[in-house]
């Protein structure tokens, strides 16, 4: 449970819980809205990463990594996946938040949750599109450092980030 102590913030209480297969439809719908909303922030088109709008992909991801849902009350407002790579290294993937819940500090809470939920992980990795300045700012503010760029699908550049904990 992550509680917000700021009484001025309209998101008073956010819970982060493991996602289950019955959440796949809701997660796919929120993911679709979140990634397609990025067109307002520089995305070259209305789309997202492979499988972003597929309930089947969401269920498969639950088997490949630790998939979490973000809840406000009983409403799923986002999700993210932690892919453990080994005992001390993990990748944070597919962080997405419902458009009407964005810019409220939830992303920062997700990053803090991941680090606290996986205390053995000392090396975090993630990536974000080069056009998404909002997520770049979030990750850099949280201590992530740019380490490279890739263009895996030939569509746009992803900026790779890492964070090493002491």
Where are these regions (language model features)?
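A conserved beta-turn-beta hairpin within the catalytic core of GNAT-like acetyltransferases
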Residues: 84-93, 102, 120-122, 153-157
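Conserved GNAT acetyl-CoA-binding A-motif
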Residues: 117-129
């Amino acid at each position: 449970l992550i509680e917000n102590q700021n009484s001025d913030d309209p998101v008073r209480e956010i819970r982060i819980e493991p996602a289950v297969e019955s959440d796949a439809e809701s997660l796919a719908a929120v993911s679709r809205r979140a990634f397609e909303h990025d067109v307002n922030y520089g995305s070259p088109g209305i789309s997202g990463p492979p499988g972003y709008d597929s309930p089947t992909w969401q269920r498969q991801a639950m088997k490949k990594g630790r998939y979490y849902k973000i809840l406000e009350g009983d409403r799923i407002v986002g999700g993210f996946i932690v892919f453990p790579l080994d005992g001390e290294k993990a990748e944070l993937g597919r962080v997405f938040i419902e458009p009407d819940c964005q810019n409220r500090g939830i992303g920062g809470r997700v990053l803090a949750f991941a680090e606290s939920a996986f205390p053995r992980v000392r090396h975090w990795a993630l990536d974000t599109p080069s056009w998404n300045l909002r997520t770049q700012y979030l990750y850099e503010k949280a201590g992530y450092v740019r380490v490279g760029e890739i263009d895996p699908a030939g569509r746009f550049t992803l900026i790779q980030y890492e964070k090493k904990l002491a």
